Structures are given as C-alpha cells and as structure tokens.
C-alpha cells in the first residue's frame, strides 16, 4: 500500500473524512486536511488503532452510574445561564434586537456577514429566519409573542413558511439526510465552463451555442459513482449574486474555472469575489492543460497573487484540480473532489413533507404559459401541489426533469421545470408548497400588499446616509465596489483608498475591476450593502435602472481627488462626534442664603465670562474640588434667567448639593459636540515621522 490521502484512508475504514480527521487529532497525528498524505507505515498503525477501538466499543459496557446531585445541579445552573429574549412581531428590526441582546448593530452586521454570509443594514426590518440566525450566533433563545389580530403590515406568511423549515432543521436533526450538492460553475469568458459541463453530461451543448459562449441558464443533474451532483450553468455570475441578494441561496459549492493558457483574468477575479462574499466553498479547476502553452504552475502562482487562494499542495486549503474539459483528463478527480467537499460540509435536507424550492429561471412560453426552472431544496414536489412564489401562486400542472421528460415528483437538489403558475414568478425567489390553492392566493395577495407598503421605505446605504448611520463606538466597515478604465487606474484608486484606512473605520474593497459598471456590480453591492465608485467609466443603462430599483448608490468620477474628498466626508460622518469641555466663566460665592422649602442658595459674584443655566459648574474650596454637576436654578435678582454675564451678581441653586460656603470658587463650563475626523494611515505616518 503506497501513501494515501486522508480521504482515501477514510474510505478504507468506512468513515467520513471529517470523522477520520477528528480521530487523527485525538491520536495526535498531525494532518492538515482531508487532502493531506499519510505514509504506508502510519496508515497501517492508524488502521490497527481504530480497529482496536471499534472492537472495544462493541464489548458490553458497564451500566452507567446515575448522575449525582452535583451534576444535576450543574446542568440546571447551565440552563439558567442561557439568555432568552421575547420579541413582538413589530420588533423584528436590527436596531431593536441589538439593544435587547446588548450587542452593537455594527458588530452584528460584521459577524453575520463574515461568519454566516448574511448581509444586513442598520435598522433593517428582518425576516424571522434572519432573527433566528442572529440569536443563534450569540447563543440566545427567542420567543415571538403571538397577537390575537395581526394586520398585513405585521406578518409576512412567507417568513412563517421559511420558519417552518428552520424549525425542522433545528428540532428534527435526526431526520435530516445528505442531499446531492448543487454546484455553480464560474469563470472568465471562453475559459471552458460550458465545455466542462458538456464533458460531464456527455452531450454536445457547447457546439449549439453561439461562438461557444453560454447564452442561456440551465440546471442539470449527473450521477457519479452512484452519487448525484446538480450543476447550475449560468452566463457569468449575475444569477448567483442576484439569488443571494434576494435571500434564495441555492449554491452549495462553486467551481472556479481558470484556463491554464490564460491565467487569472478580470472575470475570474469578479467571479471569485462573488463566491467569497457568499461564503461558499470554492474548488479551482485549472482547464485546458492539454494546450501546448498551458502553464499550471504559473496559474497556481496567479491564484495566490491575485486571489489569495493557496493550493493545498502548497500548504493552503484550496483544492485545485488540473483538467482538460476537451479530453476529459482530470474531470473524474474534479467530480470526486466535489463529492468530498459536499461530504465535509455535511450538505443535508429535510427529505419528507411539503417541498420548498428555488427558482433559477422563469419566462412566459407562448404554448405552455408561465414556466419556471427550479431546484428543490427540501421535501418532495408533486404534480397537483398548491404553490406560492414571491409574486404569484398556482397549482403544479406539470413537472419536467432536466431532459424535459414528464415526471410526477421531484426530490431535493433535483432541477425541475414547473408549469401551473398564474403569472411568471420572480427569478431567484423561493417556492413553497401550501395546503390549498385558496390559501396560496391569500398568502400572495397579502404579500403583494405588504411589499407595496414597504416599497417607499426600502433603500440601501449611500454615502450621505453613512453620516447618520451606526453611531456605536466599535470599528465600522464600509464595503466598496471599484470600477475604473484601466488596471493602472484601479491600482491608483486602491492606493488612494488604502491611505484612508484608519483605526476607527475599515474600508473593505469587495471587488475591483476594469470596464463599465454592470448589473453584476450592482447586484454584488446590493448583496453586501456596498457603494459603487467608478473612475472614468460609465454606468450601462441596465445597471442604472437596476441600481435605482435596488437602492444602490453608484458614483462616477473623472478626477481621483474628488472621489477621495467625497469618501473622506462620508468617513467623517460615520464617526460619533467628540464631546469637548469648554470653560465659559468664573465666579465666587459671596453670601449663602437659607430659604425654607428650597434649601441653600449661593449669592454669586461673576468674575469673568458667564454662567449658563443649561451648563455645568465645578466648586473649589481651598483649591480642592468639592462638587461638579448641574445648575438647578439661575436667578438675576428675582427673575429666572438662562445666562448671567460678568460683572453681574446672581443667585444659584446647585443640583443635589447644599454644602456651600462663602469664599467657594466657581468654574462654569459647557459640553460641546465637535465633529471628529478619522486619523488616516497616511496622516498617522506623517505624524510619526515628525
């Protein structure tokens, strides 16, 4: 037996790679991932050790002792420690939830995007599943108060439908089963995406498409060694990101295709940024290795330099598979790696009951009427089911598989064409099966009313709004999408923006590319609540319309100085104003009056400046501070006044302090809020040099 990779050894032991990695860690065997090698001698030792453990595990075990009182008490204490909050239906807003759980909004936004791939906005009205994800992240239980009567504005039944599946995933984990992974193939134009899918499906799709470039979206399912994989074929990555922006994630794994004779190109970078923003596992397929000028090692180097993807064989954690889609070389290994990643990520579903699915394509067919291509996520979709989508409803009249053969049922991860909707459903929306056609109609009508009511309030972040947003004190993040006319301009933009980095605010460049601002850029900005900055480029008409529709702020500039100045103003607006104390006057207590039902009042001679009724005062006695606080009342003779200036006399009652003596010195001051400027990297470096 020659040396083996960890996942190959796992097969021999009839274990999953994940289980074997855990066992190896307990045994003290140092391996990095499922792709790491184990030599023959070590493999034999591991096999012997694990087989011995299995034998011991099969032996009858001694009866377990009942838990002692201390253990029971400890469990009760632990349960009590778990925090629980109650929310009303109208409290499903990010700012309210942040206040209730004691975590700043910006911290929640950052954690949810980085750890769970969910893009949120300050003050956003949240879906139930988004609330549950937030509370799950911070280990807090939730209880939604039920109300006897709820209006259209208070409850979205689509959220309740989604919650049904969330609860199934939480409460019935033992019923979840593995499902086929859904894979999106991305990459630069002409790098071989369609040819790869063609090779996998063993059909000649590429030859029928104009110029060999994909012109339509489709989903296909193939079988590999008895296991199924579903592939979404998309022109570019607009579908992928638009689906994410609308909350309908269908993709489990991304295969990033890079040509070995061309290397990492602009659309490769763009595709990678979209996949990275979605927090989806990425497998790199280096294609066209059969070409004479193919250079796999150089391509790997570009993956490291341009994308930060380090291949596993170089000590990183990115699976890179050299292939030739034309000859088929390496394709079997790629499929094997897809199944391995699916197994490692434990892709599962709830296999029974009413189905939910994601629409990936929809249109109005002259003969068949409204049709939709979808991928089933959970349950079983059947002919005759009553269904709802975001904007329409219907009853499933016909189902067709990816080869356009009529079927009666569709199962998780299966691509299917659905006929029977009343109208063309929104692309990238979720589909749910409900109990009846009447209920479906009621749900959608209420949904449309709700969306219409919210339409005016729906908007994303723009540069001006950043001046009012997120006034918490933790570090803030601004997501940027940059487009410029040349790579030199992109480099100049990045350099200028990096100089605006500060301790208080992080500028996160989600994507930077060359060429006009497209719909793909807009959808990416919508997904991450980012701002698009263009330098010497135009916005195409379709992207402009989409930006207006999605509420994405798009700015274009011809002078880099103006872009930087606008950004500086926005960053300054993100910082909470600084409170600065300003001394406005001094005085001395010349007489102390005792007034019944009032207490002690100081007769004060103003020495300089003024005393402000809405300001503050400090009292010094023999050089020592004896009081600092507010002025309760300020009088000039018998009149209440707001200000007394030197050299006038006045009567002052101090808030909560009566221990005043003649001769006490007074210092009057006010607190002013001063606009705070970030300390930019460049300015900080200059100061340090000085």
UniProtKB/Swiss-Prot annotation:
Residues 178-346 form the tr-type G domain. GTP binds at residues 187-194, 233-237, 287-290. One of its GO terms (molecular function) is GTP binding. Pfam families: EF-G_D2, GTP_EFTU, IF-2, IF2_N. Residues 212-216 are annotated as: G2. Keywords: Cytoplasm, GTP-binding, Initiation factor, Nucleotide-binding, Protein biosynthesis. GO terms for cellular component: cytoplasm; cytosol. The keyword Protein biosynthesis applies. Residues 233-236 are annotated as: G3. Residues 324-326 are annotated as: G5. Residues 187-194 are annotated as: G1. Residues 287-290 are annotated as: G4. InterPro entries: EF-G-like_DII, IF2_II, IF2_N, P-loop_NTPase, Small_GTP-bd, T_Tr_GTP-bd_dom, TF_IF2_bacterial-like, TIF_IF2. GO terms for biological process: translational initiation. It is found in: Cytoplasm. Its main location: cytoplasm. NCBIfam families: IF-2 (TIGR00487), small_GTP (TIGR00231). One of the essential components for the initiation of protein synthesis. Protects formylmethionyl-tRNA from spontaneous hydrolysis and promotes its binding to the 30S ribosomal subunits. Also involved in the hydrolysis of GTP during the formation of the 70S ribosomal complex. PANTHER family: TR-TYPE G DOMAIN-CONTAINING PROTEIN, TRANSLATION INITIATION FACTOR IF-2-RELATED. Belongs to the TRAFAC class translation factor GTPase superfamily. Classic translation factor GTPase family. IF-2 subfamily. This is Translation initiation factor IF-2. It comes from Thermotoga maritima (strain ATCC 43589 / DSM 3109 / JCM 10099 / NBRC 100826 / MSB8). The gene is infB.
């Amino acid at each position: 037996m020659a040396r083996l990779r960890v996942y190959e050894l796992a097969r021999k032991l009839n274990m999953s790679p994940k289980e074997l990695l855990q066992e190896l860690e307990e045994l003290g065997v140092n391996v990095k991932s499922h792709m790491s090698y184990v030599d023959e001698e070590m493999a034999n030792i591991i096999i012997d050790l694990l087989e011995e453990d299995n034998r011991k595990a099969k032996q009858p075990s001694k009866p377990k002792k009942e838990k002692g009182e201390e253990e029971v008490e400890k469990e009760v204490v632990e349960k009590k420690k778990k925090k629980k909050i109650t929310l009303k239906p109208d409290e499903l807003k990010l700012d309210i939830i942040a206040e209730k759980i004691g975590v700043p909004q910006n911290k929640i936004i950052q954690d949810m995007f980085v750890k769970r791939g969910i893009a949120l906005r300050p003050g956003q009205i949240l879906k139930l599943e988004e609330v549950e994800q937030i509370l799950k992240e911070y280990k807090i239980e939730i209880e939604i108060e039920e109300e006897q009567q709820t209006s259209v504005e208070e409850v979205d039944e689509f959220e309740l439908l989604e919650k049904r599946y969330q609860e199934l995933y939480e409460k019935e984990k033992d019923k979840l089963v593995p499902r086929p992974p859904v894979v999106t193939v991305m990459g630069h134009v002409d790098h071989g995406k369609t040819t790869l899918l063609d090779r996998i499906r063993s059909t000649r799709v590429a030859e029928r498409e104009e110029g060999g470039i994909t012109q339509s979206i489709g989903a296909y399912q193939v079988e590999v060694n008895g296991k199924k994989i579903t592939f979404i074929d998309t022109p570019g990555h607009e579908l992928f990101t638009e689906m994410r922006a609308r909350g309908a994630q269908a993709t489990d794994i991304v295969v990033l295709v890079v040509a070995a004779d061309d290397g990492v190109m602009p659309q490769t970078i763009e595709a990678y940024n979209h996949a990275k923003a979605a927090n989806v596992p990425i497998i790199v397929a280096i294609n066209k290795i059969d070409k004479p000028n193919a250079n796999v090692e150089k391509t790997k180097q570009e993956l490291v330099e341009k994308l930060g993807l380090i291949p596993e064989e170089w000590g990183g954690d990115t699976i890179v598979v050299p292939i030739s889609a034309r000859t088929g070389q390496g394709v079997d290994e790629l499929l094997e790696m897809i199944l391995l990643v699916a197994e490692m990520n434990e892709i599962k579903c709830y296999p029974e009951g009413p189905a939910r699915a994601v629409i990936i394509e929809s249109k109005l067919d002259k003969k068949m009427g409204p049709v939709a291509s979808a991928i089933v996520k959970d349950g079983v979709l059947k002919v005759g089911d009553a269904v709802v989508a975001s904007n329409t409803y219907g009853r499933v009249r016909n189902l067709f598989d990816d080869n356009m053969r009529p079927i009666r049922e569709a199962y998780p991860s299966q691509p299917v064409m659905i006929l029977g909707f009343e109208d063309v459903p929104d692309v990238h929306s979720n589909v749910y099966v409900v109990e009846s056609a009447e209920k479906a109609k009621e749900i959608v009508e209420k949904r449309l009313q709700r969306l219409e009511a919210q339409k005016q309030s729906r908007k994303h972040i723009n540069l001006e709004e950043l001046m009012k947003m997120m006034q918490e004190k933790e570090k803030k993040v601004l997501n940027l999408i940059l487009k410029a006319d040349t790579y030199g301009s992109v480099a100049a933009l990045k350099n200028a923006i990096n100089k605006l980095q500060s301790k208080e605010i992080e500028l996160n460049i989600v994507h930077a590319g060359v060429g006009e601002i497209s719909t793909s850029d807009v959808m990416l900005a919508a997904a991450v609540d980012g701002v698009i900055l263009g330098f010497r480029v135009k916005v195409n008409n379709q992207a402009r319309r989409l930006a207006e529709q999605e509420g994405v702020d798009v700015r274009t500039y011809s002078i880099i100085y103006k872009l930087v100045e606008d950004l500086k103003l926005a960053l300054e607006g993100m910082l909470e104003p600084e409170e600065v104390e300003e001394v406005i006057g001094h005085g001395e207590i010349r007489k102390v009056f005792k007034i019944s039902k009032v207490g002690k009042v100081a007769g004060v001679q103003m020495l300089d400046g003024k005393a402000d009724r809405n300001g503050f005062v400090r009292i010094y006695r023999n050089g020592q501070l004896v009081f600092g606080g507010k002025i309760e009342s300020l009088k000039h003779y018998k009149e209440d006044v707001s200000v007394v200036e030197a050299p006038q006399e006045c009567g002052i009652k101090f808030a909560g302090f009566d221990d005043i003596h003649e001769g006490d010195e007074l210092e009057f001051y006010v607190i002013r809020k001063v606009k705070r400027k970030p300390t930019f990297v460049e300015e900080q470096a200059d100061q340090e040099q000085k």
